């Protein structure tokens, strides 16, 4: 699998932008009002609800891609952004500059090193479209839609949880073997994606000032 293609490169930032949140302020108070849940096993409903309650509009990331086509991991750094109501952006800043933007049903890819700017429609990529719809469902708290597209497995408690997603439909399976999210409360720490051919990508989110 080549994570450099538009289709697959858009998947990871999409996951992060639609799910990366932080429980702060009112959301944190809401969690406390329901008692201390840190010692109780969490469910997918609780994870999705926590992620829905709060999010950051900008977060830095470091992404490592492991592929049979590479002699060593490819590591890139950049910023993920969300602009309401539904614009998602991944900007790679190091070691080269690239930009991916998902707006409604359009995906735009820009690369300085490749001297290219291209826009595609999600209508032409059923597998990616199903992923988009599933994660939008996650952000809006629609657990039923998420379960419709993925087999979901949650382990851990509110302090430290993992959410494993495996596509149900053939289109999704052709693109992703699984997605594994790990985090605490309403924050995602890492997202790992494994492709059917064994290639994988791991993104670590870094809170703090963005470039």
PLM regions and their residue ranges:
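N-terminal secretory signal peptides that target proteins for export/translocation
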Residues: 1-7
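Bacterial N-terminal signal peptides
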Residues: 10-22
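N-terminal leader/targeting segments and the immediate start of mature chains
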Residues: 25-62, 66-72
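Short hydrophobic/aromatic-rich beta-strand segments that constitute the beta-sheet cores
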Residues: 61, 88-91, 107-110, 163-165, ...
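Amphipathic hydrophobic-ligand
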Residues: 72-78, 178, 199
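An acidic-aromatic
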Residues: 79-130, 201
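Flexible, surface-exposed loop/linker segments and immediately adjacent secondary-structure boundaries
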Residues: 115-161
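Gly/Pro-enriched, hydrophobic low-complexity segments
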Residues: 143-152, 156-211
């Amino acid at each position: 699998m080549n994570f450099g293609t538009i289709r697959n490169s858009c998947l990871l930032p999409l996951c992060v932008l639609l799910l990366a949140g932080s429980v702060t302020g009112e959301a944190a108070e809401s969690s406390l009002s329901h008692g201390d849940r840190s010692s109780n096993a969490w469910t997918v409903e609780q994870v999705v609800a926590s992620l829905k309650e709060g999010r950051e509009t900008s977060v830095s990331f470091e992404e490592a891609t492991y592929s049979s086509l590479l002699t060593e991991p490819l590591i890139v750094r950049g910023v993920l952004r969300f602009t309401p109501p539904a614009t998602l952006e991944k900007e790679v800043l190091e070691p080269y500059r690239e930009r991916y933007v998902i707006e409604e049903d359009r995906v735009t890819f820009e690369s300085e090193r490749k001297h290219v700017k291209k826009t595609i429609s999600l209508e032409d990529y059923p597998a990616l479209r199903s992923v988009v719809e599933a994660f939008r469902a996650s952000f809006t708290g629609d657990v039923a839609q998420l379960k419709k597209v993925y087999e979901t497995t949650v382990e851990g408690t509110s302090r430290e949880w993992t959410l494993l997603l495996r596509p149900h439909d053939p289109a999704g399976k052709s693109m992703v073997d699984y997605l594994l999210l790990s985090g605490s409360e309403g924050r995602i720490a890492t997202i790992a994606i494994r492709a059917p051919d064994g290639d994988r990508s791991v993104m670590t989110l870094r809170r703090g000032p963005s470039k």
